[in-house]
Amino acid sequence: MEKRICPLTNITVPVFNRYDETLATLSALRARTRSPCILTVVDNGSEADLRKELLRMQDEKVIDKLFILDRNYGVSCACNLGWRSVEAPFFMKVDNDIKVIADNWLESIYSAWGTYRYSSITGPVWNCAAPYNRFDTPHGTMWSAPVSLSGAAFIVGRKIHEHIGYFSEDYGLYGEEDADYCLRCHHAGIRKFSYEASALLEHVDGAKDAEYNAWKVAAHNKNVGGKKDEGIFALNLFLYEHKLRALDVPLKYEVKSMRGFYVEMRERDAYSRFFDALLYCLGLFNESCRKPDAGTMEKMRIALDKVSDHRQ
């Protein structure tokens, strides 16, 4: 059998409560990952019983790197902290409701992805029957995705990261970080591929997560909604498309203090000024029914240029 060699991967799992799902995700990742990886976990202020289990798993070397935040700073912040904590050729975000079910899962993804791994990003799809944009390899099936990918088990290589940067932290506690990243790649001409995950990964969330899922829907609606203070994601889509802000976005948070596993973040002053300008642009965007004319676009450009150059 041909030996398949995988690059070192920083697998980062952002965590916020969901005790059973989180433990299932982390246990399966450690037990079934044969390829070289660093398992990084960033806890977003979960309840004490889960934090205790995470510390135990770190002590037992199930987890390689653990960060426990003092409160919930959002999915993007947690992912970005884990991302920049490890020097690795590839970064992988795995949600804490994804369970690995195959020992060769990571090898299979990289083998199917092939040399495209250096010039594209990839994310999972389950039981996809679409005949278009499909290509089969000896190691699995891939699909060329037109715009967006699932962020549930999402891989980005260093070359792409150097151009596009980190996840956007514009969207609050739960946002459109994966869709936003895909859009930035789209506007940079970077290809996106879906890999068939049905034999590799499964979701472990259930009916008891109804309250959590309702919270996610509410957060999504705020990011895309049409009310006066809603629609940051829709605005960013417009700004990227019209080159009014850069594709490598500014980070909201930086580390304030770190004591052992415990981390406190703070908002960067530069980001605070930038976000005020972004909210001003959001007001203009919504007042124009999301169809800004040339004069309104110029006001947006000037507002963003005052805080720094966020255009390409």
Segments the model singles out, each with a brief description of its role:
Residues S76, H139-K159, Y174:
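A recurrent flexible, glycine/aromatic-enriched loop bordering the glycosyltransferase active site
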Residues M1-A28:
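N-proximal low-complexity "stem/linker" segments adjacent to membrane-targeting elements
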Residues F91:
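Short aromatic/hydrophobic "clamp" motif used to bind/position activated sugar donors
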Residues D43-K52:
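A conserved acidic beta->alpha catalytic loop
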Residues D103-F135:
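Conserved donor NDP-sugar-binding/catalytic core segment of glycosyltransferases
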Residues L173-R311:
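C-terminal catalytic/acceptor-binding lobe
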Residues L69-V86:
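Glycine-rich, basic loop-to-helix element that forms the pyrophosphate-binding segment
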Residues S27-P36:
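Short, acidic, metal-binding catalytic loop of nucleotide-sugar glycosyltransferases
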